[in-house]
Amino acid sequence: MQTWSSVAVPRVPGTSRPLRLYDTATGQIRPTAPGRVAKMYVCGITPYDATHLGHAATYLAFDLVHRLWLDAGHEVHYVQNVTDIDDPLLERAERDSEDWVVLGLRETALFREDMEALRVLPPRDFVGAVESIPEVVEMIEKLLASGAAYRVDDPEYPDVYFDRSFTGRFGYESNYDDETMRAIFPERGGDPDRPGKRDPLDALLWRVERPGEPAWDSSLGRGRPGWHIECSAIALKHLGIGFDVQGGGSDLVFPHHEFSAAHAEAMTGEHPFARHYVHAGMIGLDGEKMSKSKGNLVFVSRLRADDVDPSAIRLALFAGHYRDDREWTDELLKQANSRLARWREAVSLPSGPDAEATVDRLRDHLADDLDTPKALAAVDAWVDEALRHRSGTVGSESAPALVRAAVDSLLGVVL
């Protein structure tokens, strides 16, 4: 798939900081410590509707990871998938009497436009599930050969499932107990009541063709892949086992990321799938999680159509910590617009307070598990001082330009 256009990222004087992130698997904030090439996989959209602010918050969080690694001098290999074949996409297409391929292409194109408008640095590899079916099939064949996968005893639909007990490590990523897993599994695409499964929590790898559903020829028979195996196959192909960060929303902790890791580890015999499992909180509206199923959505494209500045959207979402569930409100956007106006006024002055310490604090806070509230407060403090002394010469003539470059480079906000 074609990715979106990138933007120039200014070089900022001073010393970068090693990035530390909260790892869901260990429950600790730990250094990411990548090599020369930092490797990140972030789960992408299922393209049956437009990009909402819950999506935006997730991709903006990992955009900060990307930017901080660049600031530290790393080359970044970022991979993102598109789940362009899945039940929700097929269900929406049927509801609207639309071809599922056309629907997926249109919404993927809109997603690219939204990401470009928000100045999210693009992935090097933007990969659809459909184009990855050969890799998925090869992986499932290996899992079957090793005993990690099995076919259900169903003469009509002998689907292939993953045996979750195979690795002996299942559950390490989410740290959920069986009771919690069993409660969540059916809510997030699982089929615990499928006859013939060894365990209700075993995950689908290959769905044999059903009447009226899209299917592909393969050595497994005509069918289509399960959700979790798609990300396993794409990540292994482009990044290999043991990459630095597996990212996504907190609703992907289980079953998606747990099974993606288990599939890859079962096939390779190596552990871990990723060195950090990092999850962004949910964005709510009117007291409920913003989601397509609930229909309580604020779309990025609608905000853009209403001439909302993308930098204000970034600042509004950065006002809360990325791991926290938080509310989107009109007041939040109003405050972000006010903050953006003040910042722009301050950096337009001919001089300002010395800014090196401000840039240091900005780096410190962002490197500490992406603490954007403190990072924004550090810039606010410099802006307040600059505006207090706007009528006279204060500090340095180069300070406004330094703050502008740092805010652009590290926060992706244009001043």
From Swiss-Prot:
UniProt keyword list: ATP-binding, Ligase, Metal-binding, Nucleotide-binding, Zinc
A Pfam entry, by short name: tRNA-synt_1e
GO molecular-function terms, A-Z: ATP binding; cysteine-glucosaminylinositol ligase activity; cysteine-tRNA ligase activity; zinc ion binding
Entry's cofactor comment: Binds 1 zinc ion per subunit.
Annotated signal sequence range: none
Enzyme class: ligase
Protein function: Catalyzes the ATP-dependent condensation of GlcN-Ins and L-cysteine to form L-Cys-GlcN-Ins.
Name listed for the protein in its UniProt record: L-cysteine:1D-myo-inositol 2-amino-2-deoxy-alpha-D-glucopyranoside ligase
Native source species: Saccharomonospora viridis (strain ATCC 15386 / DSM 43017 / JCM 3036 / CCUG 5913 / NBRC 12207 / NCIMB 9602 / P101) (Thermoactinomyces viridis)
